[in-house]
């Protein structure tokens, strides 16, 4: 069980020059990659680390709001406006841990949901936006890096893509 300070410090250590699998041997070190990207951006702009944790929390909050908005937009036709709104609010307020930070469990959950939303939108909107597949794959990779056991979800996603491709509506890359 990790706490917010530990999760934050992993990304900070990468920004300051520690190297994965060389100077860092924590079991959660790969979950430091997204936090390190956000921290590097913040320190490059601000020139200091003062306020960095608040910035990371704000980025997570904005990402959660965007995912919730996409969820609402994509599911309001299927489950109705009220059901989609309630579900989107639950998605927004749900936090796998007690803090809004860059820990591996939160990353695994949010990146998996983001990958699902990308693939779902790509499928339901007629395979017209291939960049969503790329974005979904990047989100899935971050999910797998944050919590390597979640790579088992790749098999489920792949089977889903194959089954959707067999319906005859998908691109030939999904047909097996």
What are these regions (language model features)?
Residues 124, 153-176:
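Perimembrane helix-loop-helix junctions
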Residues 1-6:
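Helix-to-loop transition at the C-terminal end of transmembrane segments
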Residues 31, 35-42, 55-70, 108-111:
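Transmembrane alpha-helices of multi-pass, membrane-embedded glycan-processing enzymes
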Residues 77-79, 113-133, 165-168:
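Membrane-interface transmembrane helices that cradle and orient dolichyl/undecaprenyl
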Residues 96, 131-148, 154-161:
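Membrane-interface alpha helices of multi-pass inner-membrane proteins
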């Amino acid at each position: 069980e990790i706490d917010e300070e530990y999760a934050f410090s992993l990304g900070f250590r990468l920004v300051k020059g520690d190297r994965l699998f060389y100077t860092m041997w924590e079991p959660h070190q790969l979950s430091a990659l997204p936090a390190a990207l956000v921290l590097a951006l913040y320190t490059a702009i601000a020139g200091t680390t003062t306020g960095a944790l608040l910035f990371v929390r704000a980025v997570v909050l904005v990402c959660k709001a965007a995912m919730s908005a996409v969820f609402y937009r994509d599911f309001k036709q299927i489950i109705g406006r009220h059901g989609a709104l309630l579900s989107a609010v639950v998605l927004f307020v749900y936090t796998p841990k007690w803090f809004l930070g860059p820990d591996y469990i939160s990353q695994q959950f949010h990146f998996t949901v983001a990958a699902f939303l990308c693939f779902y939108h790509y499928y339901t909107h007629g395979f017209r936006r291939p960049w969503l597949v790329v974005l979904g794959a990047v989100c899935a990779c971050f999910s797998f890096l944050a919590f390597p056991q979640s790579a088992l979800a790749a098999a489920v996603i792949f089977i889903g893509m194959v089954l959707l491709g067999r319906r005859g509506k998908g691109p030939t890359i999904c047909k097996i």
